[in-house]
Amino acid sequence: MANKTQLRVEAINNGTVIDHIPANIGIKVLKLFQMDKSAERVTVGLNLPSSALGAKDLLKIENTFITPEQASKLALYAPHATVNQIENYEVVKKIPLVLPEQITGVFECPNSNCITHGEPVDSSFKVLTKKEDIHLKCKYCEKVYSREVVTDLN
């Protein structure tokens, strides 16, 4: 039987740790940042026990540091996730997640009649928040979608 203090996921020397991702969202985050195509070692923890969430996902990406722009995209998938930059096995920086006001070229508009499906234009959404709910309003067709509807398509 494992010692109670034993880590279930190995520590990394340098890189980024994204913790407290809601369960079943980790793979989407992995694909969003194309970590599944990275040559660096990526450790994925799915459905790990969490006192706050019940279950959570965790990503550790060696020798890779996410940008503030990537952190704002991450906020759409996991607004309460924590992002830590690691150097020499120590947390050197905690990156706050802030929802962007606008997000362009990341998500596909769910409206099949939207101009973004037939023309060479990047999708663009205004991010709307109301309490804990996050909605995205398409710049072109002006339809409003819940965050889950848009992020589930991609």
Swiss-Prot record:
A single BP term in Gene Ontology: 'de novo' pyrimidine nucleobase biosynthetic process
GO cellular component: aspartate carbamoyltransferase complex
Pfam families from the UniProt entry: PyrI, PyrI_C
InterPro entries: Asp_carbamoyltransf_reg_N, Asp_carbamoylTrfase_reg, Asp_carbamoyltrfase_reg_C, Asp_carbatrfase_reg_C_sf, Asp_carbatrfase_reg_N_sf
Keywords: Metal-binding, Pyrimidine biosynthesis, Zinc
Chain residues that bind Zn(2+): C109, C114, C138, C141
Function: Involved in allosteric regulation of aspartate carbamoyltransferase.
Subunit structure of this chain's protein: Contains catalytic and regulatory chains.
Protein name (database record): Aspartate carbamoyltransferase regulatory chain
